[in-house]
Amino acid sequence: EKAESALKTAVSAVATFSRLFGEYPYEYLSVAGSPGAEICNASGIYTVGEDQNESLFTDSVIFGAARQWWGGVVGFDAVNCAFMQEGLSEYSASVFYEKNANYSVSFDERMRDATLSYSLFVTELKPKSTAMQRKICDFNNETEYLFCTRLKGELLLHSIRKTVGDKAFFESLKSFYGENSGKVASPDCLFASIEKTCGKNLKSYSDSWINGNDVVGKT
């Protein structure tokens, strides 16, 4: 049953992301189950942990598919700029639900939950730094890593989308994907694509998030 569900979701994810970001370039996509909850990715294949409840399993299938675009076709420096693939993939997963109402997952609720979770992380755990662009070894633990790369990366992208509008935002992601396929892209490449499309200077704004000088979650 999980295998059939994963197949249907992966097919929907590939169709959605191909439409939004650019065509999936490989002839096949293989999704394999594995023990635990970890996702392992390679070009044209990824694994999904089977020891998860139904909603988390579905999230993992969608996130893994998004990683084929972000971290697969478009490469990133996963050691120093992990927030690129983590944030883009997580936000893509949320957008999948926005574009596929039959999954009955509210995009707006996901964004509210992400904002609340990040705020609690900042106020309750009081990390010394919320900088996104760090070497993996410079994060104190997995929780800090996930909140400062995946969750905060998603929130940054959503904030930019609200600033520039849907049309410019998704056009810029499609342009970014097309121009950087088969390459290793830097954060500057992403934000340059967005700025070029929307005609706004976002460098100081994005830098404040990346360097940890933003006010998200802070009181």
What label would you give each PLM region?
Residues 23-32, 77-80, 103-109, 171-172, ...:
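Surface-exposed patches in mature extracellular/periplasmic domains of secreted proteins
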Residues 2, 6-13, 57, 61-65, ...:
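Stable alpha-helical elements in mature extracytoplasmic
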Residues 13, 73, 136-137, 161-164, ...:
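Active-site and adjacent substrate-binding regions of carbohydrate-active enzymes
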Residues 104, 143-219:
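Amphipathic alpha-helical substructures
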Residues 1-81, 92, 143:
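Juxtacatalytic substrate-recognition/specificity segment
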Residues 21-25, 69-73, 77-78, 92-104, ...:
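A generic secondary-structure signal for well-formed alpha-helical elements
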Residues 12-19, 68, 91, 95, ...:
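Residue-level signal for well-ordered alpha-helical scaffold segments within enzymatic catalytic domains
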Residues 80-82, 86-155, 163, 180, ...:
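Acidic/His/Gly-enriched intrinsically disordered linker/tail segments
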